[in-house]
Amino acid sequence: MNINIFRRRFTPWSVDGTMVIGGKIFCDTLERPNRHLPAGRYKISLIPTKQKKVSETKKKNKYERGKYEIVIKPVILLRSNYVPRTVRRRARFVPGNGPLRLRNKSIILGRSHYTGIVTQSEKCYNEFCQLLDEEFKRMKKKYLPCRINLFIRDWGVDEIPLNYLLIFQ
């Protein structure tokens, strides 16, 4: 599976892009302008992490003391043969609204309405994680090595090249 990110707009407060998966436009991306990944080829891995569990009560989303849950998160591997044990301080895909609180070269997924702001990020992030999980299960069932490649291209214009879209192939 190949995932392409075309960076379209470079502004002082954000780097806006579009994610294309399997020849279809999946969602928009957002990155911090001075801490984004350089353009190139990367691999994606799913890593299980321990996260505090949110309490069942609707009061202020307090965390339950001492209770954790296992969450699988997509991580961008900067070195090809090294898979980290944790996702702390790693480049990864995250939900969010704006790039200014981003760290570690992470990428926000969502629907872009204005330059530097995305909406519906939780929905896009969950769909992306589900898509990656299905791909890993499909590859595991066929006894093939799990290869998910991420290609980041600095495009600089709003139009995505037609040869990357499915209807023009």
Regions found by a protein language model. Name each.
Residues 1-148, 152-169:
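Cell wall/extracellular polymer interaction/catalysis modules
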